[in-house]
Curated annotation (Swiss-Prot):
Taxon lineage: Eukaryota, Viridiplantae, Streptophyta, Embryophyta, Tracheophyta
GO cellular component: chloroplast; cytoplasm; histone deacetylase complex; mitochondrion
Location(s) in or outside the cell: Plastid, Chloroplast; Mitochondrion
Record organism: Oryza sativa subsp. japonica
Protein name: Histone deacetylase 10, chloroplastic
Binding site for Zn(2+): 259, 261, 346
Thermal properties of activity per the entry: Optimum temperature is 30 degrees Celsius.
Amino acid sequence: MEQLWVPSLPILGGRILPMLRHYCGFGSHHPLTWRSLQITGRKQKHNGCWIAYCLPSHNGTSISDTNGVRKDLALPDNLLRDAHILYCTSPAMGHNKEAHPETNKRVPAIVDALEKLELTSKHRGSQVLEIQDFQPASLDDIALVHSRSYITGLEKAMSRASDEGLIFIEGTGPTYATQTTFQECLLSAGAGITLVDSVVAASKLGPKPPLGFALVRPPGHHAVPEGPMGFCVFGNIAVAARYAQNQHGLKRVMIIDFDVHHGNGTCDAFYEDPDIFFLSTHQLGSYPGTGKIHQVGQGNGEGTTLNLPLPGGSGDYAMRCAFDEVIAPAAQRFKPDIILVSAGYDAHALDPLAGLQFTTGTFYMLAARIREVAAELCGGRCVFFLEGGYNLESLSSSVADTFRAFLGEPSLAARFDDPAMLYEEPTRKIREAIDKAKHLHSL
């Protein structure tokens, strides 16, 4: 199978959108949406559910960006006021490779768990809203973070992927593409943008806006400005951060990344930016080998990158200490206008790709504490973005418990976590790492 380095490719000239419209049987006047491009996946379930449709022609709540452009959200004010959770799903069913850990089964597994644990609108009414038919991100949105040469190169690569079935787009790395990858990645980025729009609109209606969760794939936090990396194609959270700044005037954005791997792409995008605070906890020495504790940003951005690499075996104790002593104080000092979260669930003890030992309860704690910090500092404006998590059981139970934290309900971690799978955490090394981060950042 031929390997392809995408950023070196020439411009395609927009062939992918007509091709996909033809493939889906839509005329060029139809908006491209998640459902119109879904190749296979879960069936639509109404059953009395609240389902919010985000189409420009639909009448509903609207917001104005910093350029005065109005955007219809199709979310009546009463729904925004009542909602505790807004979420979008973009499972990217066509973006798949057999035996690859980043599989198209990930998002459906989460959705199934939410349904079984009665955390969907079918069971919760307007407390939990799934926004469907959201629009893909525009190429200009993606270009807020990624180079034009990469974007157009990837678009061109779709014709090769159509011929070959699957291509590799990261040189010798693990990131692949199929013929639907480009458009599905635009949809995943669009999910995050839609949730930012909706959470911001809700925050203008009352003091307790819903939290957002973009249940999307492929993940994004490894994608660098010039290309793909580590299963990631576009930096979903980075695009949303720039969008929040440019379209909503939310100047100060805090990004918390608790994936087991360092979010090097997000870090690179904002390493010199004083208005975006990037904070990553990750396993020391894990892929991609970046995120050293002394890397704190540079130029005007010095001090707005905080890396906290944790020793292998770190778990609930480590993250509780990290949150109390590093994450919360850093947020309180930075005073963000919105908090975005790279929610990777591959730090779970059952995950096959790394060596931390978080539990379902750890992720519940993180979600609950981040919710509290967002309420205290930025009017509750907070959106989570799915990153890693490759054991479908631990991934789905942990995301479900995240939803319970958003709702302010007790954790069900005891149903999923087996204490026998855990071993003693390296407390001395954990303390050394936390103390060093506190010293470097004067916390």
